[in-house]
């Protein structure tokens, strides 16, 4: 199973992501792949993301799966 990106803290709506906000974890259902963490830095979330929430592609403005 591949790791997905999970919120390490509460991320308020419209916040630009930084490395400390995210961690890699194997979760079900899978979200954004952990290897995309470098691409997520600087992108904004379009909703509040609670700690422990798996980041899904539709939660991050400008993110497109490769």
Swiss-Prot record:
What SUPFAM superfamilies has UniProt attached to this entry?
AFP III-like domain
Using the UniProt record, give the first listed, main subcellular location.
Answer: secreted
| Location of the protein in the cell | Secreted
Which keywords does UniProt give here? Antifreeze protein, Secreted
- Show the GO cellular component annotation of the record: extracellular region
Limits of the AFP-like domain: 4-63
Instruction: Report the record's disulfide bonds.
Output: none
Write down the CDD domains for this protein, in alphabetical order: Antifreeze_III
Per the similarity annotation, which family is this?
A: Belongs to the type-III AFP family.
Described by its record, this protein's role is as follows:
Contributes to protect fish blood from freezing at subzero sea water temperatures. Lowers the blood freezing point. Binds to nascent ice crystals and prevents further growth.
This chain's protein is named Ice-structuring protein LP
Organism in which the protein naturally occurs: Lycodes polaris (Canadian eelpout)
């Amino acid at each position: 199973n591949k790791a997905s990106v999970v919120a390490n803290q509460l991320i308020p709506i419209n916040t630009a992501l930084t490395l400390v906000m995210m961690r890699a974890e194997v979760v079900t259902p899978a979200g954004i792949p952990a290897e995309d963490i470098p691409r997520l830095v600087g992108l904004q979330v379009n909703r509040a993301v609670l700690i422990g929430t798996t980041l899904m592609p539709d939660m991050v403005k400008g993110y497109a799966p490769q």
